[in-house]
């Protein structure tokens, strides 16, 4: 599968990005877990500081074997000169030394339950009134089940578009 075909299948749509930007607002600090080629990363960085976290590892999800070859280079070129701080790491590794409160977290990384359990630990750094967003809701059963069981009972849903769901803390 070519990179273009794989990307078109999994990427955020313009409507999803528009909703996410509207829910976040401007002049915020946002952690993005899972950046791929940086389309959403750059869109969010137009009016915010984005902390992008992606290890660029192949095959973390056995149901979705998107090859990451070349993706990291595209990402690096795309983010150059923008208000983006990039960590080539797993989110749990960055979290170990994290100390700054953030305005929101956007989770679109490894969709396996173990990884989701690690990624949601970032919610502890989201300020009250901040946002918690997930991509691939109603697309990846692991994401849907996780969100319905662990997020829905605790937070207020404020937006949904295609595979994006956004919550207020």
What do these predicted regions represent?
Residues 3-7, 14-169:
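S-adenosylmethionine/decaboxylated-SAM
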């Amino acid at each position: 599968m070519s990179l273009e075909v794989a990307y078109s299948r999994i990427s955020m749509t313009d409507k999803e990005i528009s909703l996410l930007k509207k829910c976040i607002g401007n002049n915020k600090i946002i952690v993005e877990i899972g950046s791929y080629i940086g389309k959403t990363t750059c869109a969010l960085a137009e009016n915010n500081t984005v902390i992008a976290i992606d290890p660029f590892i192949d095959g973390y999800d056995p149901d979705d074997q998107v090859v990451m070859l070349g993706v990291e280079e595209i990402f690096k070129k795309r983010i150059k000169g923008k208000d983006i701080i990039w960590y080539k790491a797993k989110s749990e590794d960055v979290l170990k030394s994290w100390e700054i409160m953030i305005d929101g977290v956007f989770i679109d990384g490894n969709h396996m339950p173990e990884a989701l359990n690690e990624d949601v630990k970032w919610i502890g750094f989201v300020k009250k009134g901040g946002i918690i967003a997930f991509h691939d809701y109603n697309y990846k059963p692991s994401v849907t089940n996780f969100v319905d069981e662990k997020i829905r009972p605790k937070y207020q849903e404020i937006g949904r578009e295609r595979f994006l769901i956004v919550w207020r803390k």
